């Protein structure tokens, strides 16, 4: 039976609709660690306003500042943290993540076509709403995220509980495995 290192603060980044929040919640339960979502923390700071509303009100620069403040409000403890789609791309936020002891930044991935399909059924983030080509913009952003971390993990497009649990196990085996435990 493998054992997992639960002393890390795991930051999940990825494109919009990849499943950072959903997977992060399942992973936190799987590992019995607290879960934080910077989008939810940001909304809480603005009495429930959505990130889209906050972006419209403050523009790109103001929104980035607020994303950074939401990130800095996350306690430095072993936990799972779902980052807003652009949070790690913002230099102060990226430096803040890397400056934390035992931080692990992991890029969650799904095929761009799957993400475009998901975004068609949801609200497209304000940063992407006026992009000439959603697919090209997502591809460029994915390249930028890939340049920030060599830790990438491909999720399954399937969202059943069983599939998510398999993803949690695979994730832990890949990034958090310590050694085999013997119960003899």
From Swiss-Prot:
A GO BP annotation: amino acid biosynthetic process
Binding residues for Mg(2+): 21
Single Gene Ontology MF annotation: ATP binding
Binding site for ATP: 17-22
Reaction(s) the record says it catalyses: shikimate + ATP = 3-phosphoshikimate + ADP + H(+)
Pathway: Metabolic intermediate biosynthesis; chorismate biosynthesis; chorismate from D-erythrose 4-phosphate and phosphoenolpyruvate: step 5/7
Cofactor(s) it depends on: Mg(2+)
Cofactor note: Binds 1 Mg(2+) ion per subunit.
Subcellular location field: Cytoplasm
Alphabetical list of Pfam families matching this protein: SKI (PF01202)
Keywords recorded for this protein, A-Z: Amino-acid biosynthesis, Aromatic amino acid biosynthesis, ATP-binding, Cytoplasm, Kinase, Magnesium, Metal-binding, Nucleotide-binding, Transferase
Gene3D superfamilies in the cross-refs: P-loop containing nucleotide triphosphate hydrolases
Residues holding substrate: 39, 85
InterPro entries per the UniProt record, alphabetical: P-loop_NTPase, Shikimate/glucono_kinase, Shikimate_kinase/TSH1
GO CC aspect terms: cytosol
E.C. designation(s): 2.7.1.71
Family from the record: Belongs to the shikimate kinase family.
PANTHER family, alphabetized: SHIKIMATE KINASE, SHIKIMATE KINASE 1, CHLOROPLASTIC
Function: Catalyzes the specific phosphorylation of the 3-hydroxyl group of shikimic acid using ATP as a cosubstrate.
The protein's assembly and partners: Monomer.
Protein name: Shikimate kinase
Species the sequence originates in: Chlamydia trachomatis serovar D (strain ATCC VR-885 / DSM 19411 / UW-3/Cx)
